[in-house]
Amino acid sequence: MDIRTVLKDNFLQYSSYVIKDRAIASVVDGFKPVQRRIIHSLFEMHDGNFHKVANVVGNTMKYHPHGDTSIYEALVNIANKDLFIEKQGNFGNLFTGDPASASRYIECRLTPLAFDVLYSKEITIYESSYDGRNNEPLLYPAKIPVILIQGSEGIAVGMAAKILPHNFNEILNAVKSELLGESYDIYPDFPTGGIVDVNEYADGNGKVLVRAKIETIDEKTIVIRELPFGETTESLISSIEKAIRKNYIKVSSINDFTAENVAIELSLPRGVYASEVIEKLYHYTNCQISISVNLLLLSERYPVVYTIKDLIKFHAAHLQKILKMELELQKSKILEKIFYKTLEQIFIEKKIYKLLETISKEENILSIILSEVLRHKESFSREVLKEDVENLLKIPIRKISLFDIDKNSKDIKILNKELKSINSNISSIRGYSINFIDLLLAKYSKEHQRKTKISLIKSKNVKEIATKNMKVYLNLAEGFAGTSLFDGEFIGNASYYDKILVFRENSYVLKNIEDKTFIDKKNVCALVYDINNSKEQIFSIIYFNRLDNFYYVKRFKIDKFITDKVYEFLGENDEFVDFSLNPEFVEFSTNKDIVKRIEIDNFMVKSRSSIGKRISSNNLKKVKFK
């Protein structure tokens, strides 16, 4: 066989396996296979007591062929969702990122919610485990959108899923609204709290902006109280320290007082205040992160991208389907009870059992009793079978002699009342489903209050908050400028985003600020171009035109530029005379030595390539800015 064919076939098998059996969760119950197997093991082992996690992992290995480590990590992950597994012992710290204790030291058991919304053994479809020795659930008949509440993340071949967790109460209320035909909006809710901007959430397939919750104790002390989703105190502090090393922010000390709640205290040095540091924390550290989401799930073993509303609609219909199946199952059980109680009563009340005294041949017993019972077939809800007669013949004489017909009739009446209620629920399954959600909310809503605040985050441009932490020097004679040129003249403080603006006699150029940059020796001046404020700066030039022998004033702004590109502002027949940033007057003297002044505002601001305004129609001796 050709090696390319072998590789292609094996790759397809591998990629299909990873997608279907490892990385992507199901739309029905929200579980990946390993998670489903853990829950199944806990249902199997359930006796009301806590179980060693090591034992749960060992039992799960009967179903999961990938070793104990992956099972242990998945169990800890599910347990920390605080939904279906109750914990006892150290399961790690969500805030600090500290790991859980070894599996032999920690215990767990299922929560009541798991039994309320997952466990329904009689309607669960089972399949053989990987070795054929055991049966495991194909899917759980989940009554709530588990995937939206827990969230999920997985990377498969050529695709990835990133589903954020949502609030339990809000998801259930959304399903209820869907059943009622009402509108609703669903947004993420993170166990770490924080602040989330959902403007670009795009119904579960866009992105969110998440911020830490930061408080100001005083103008010199900042405390981080809540973390962005996916961050720990360790990773957050590491990002702050990195920003400090790069001189983006100034912090004198960082103290982590996190225990049950997050508390990272930042102390600020002299001359630095909380109001200016907080915005920089959001821009330069992991105090603010963007999370892209992709609602990819398995539907009937195929990957499908959903929206939040798609999932709510699916689970509203799925809830009705599951509840109806359970009601139909209850109905069949009650009908069976009514049938057998009726059969038993007729057998005893009509004294059919006495026929046993008259039958001489054993092989005739079933047929004779059955024919006698069938004389009352209108009393039965289904056909009477030979197996039913065999059950009658097993009734002890003592029970027959003590049989209470009145009590049995009352029992049948109660069962018929239950049957009527079940039939009513089946016929109005939508209302029954809404009532089921209300019962869940009444039972569990207090445990699942929203932790993340939804807010519009107005981020400043990073250039606006950049710290001017570089001192720039100029040596005009040698033609150098930079931050390490200490023998030069200090020309200003600059941020990473500022530039050095170099003016020559007929052009200008903007350069990046470096340790030492050659800017040429034939320069008029060089200065720091503030990326935020210099766009409004007016530059004034006096030049002499050799063709008409007149002096001109040109004024312009530099609001757009390309770094290192030379921009000319004088033509080949123009001769540079003077340059100024903020002149008040243009002063000139005539051939008769008369000195005059014109206010600078008389000269309009135009573009750099436009012709300047002529100062005077007379021949002038000297012109300069004042």
UniProtKB/Swiss-Prot annotation:
Picking any one GO biological process from the record gives: DNA topological change
Please verify whether the record's keywords include Ribosomal protein: no
Q: Which reaction does it catalyse?
A: ATP-dependent breakage, passage and rejoining of double-stranded DNA
* Molecular functions (GO terms): ATP binding; DNA binding; DNA topoisomerase type II (double strand cut, ATP-hydrolyzing) activity
Marked site, Interaction with DNA, at K32, H64, H66
So what does this one do? Topoisomerase IV is essential for chromosome segregation. It relaxes supercoiled DNA. Performs the decatenation events required during the replication of a circular DNA molecule.
Q: What is this protein called?
A: DNA topoisomerase 4 subunit A
What's in the keyword line of the UniProt record? Cell membrane, DNA-binding, Isomerase, Membrane, Topoisomerase
Spell out the GO cellular component terms annotated for this protein, sorted alphabetically and separated by semicolons. Answer: cytoplasm; DNA topoisomerase type II (double strand cut, ATP-hydrolyzing) complex; plasma membrane
Q: Which domain of life is it from?
A: Bacteria
The protein's gene is named parC
Membrane-crossing ranges are none
Location in the cell: Cell membrane
Q: Which organism is it from?
A: Borreliella burgdorferi (strain ATCC 35210 / DSM 4680 / CIP 102532 / B31) (Borrelia burgdorferi)
Q: Which InterPro entries match?
A: Topo_IIA-like_dom_sf, Topo_IIA_A/C_ab, Topo_IIA_A_a_sf, Topo_IIA_dom_A, Type_II_DNA_Topoisomerases
Where does the Topo IIA-type catalytic domain lie?
Answer: 24-439
Please give, as recorded in its UniProt entry, the membrane topology of this protein.
Answer: Peripheral membrane protein
EC nos:
5.6.2.2
Subunit note: Heterotetramer composed of ParC and ParE.
UniProt similarity note:
Belongs to the type II topoisomerase GyrA/ParC subunit family.
User: Which SUPFAM superfamilies did the record assign?
Assistant: Type II DNA topoisomerase (SSF56719)
One matching Pfam family is DNA_topoisoIV
Q: What class of enzyme is it?
A: isomerase
Active site (catalytic residues):
Y105
Which residue positions hold the site described Transition state stabilizer? R104
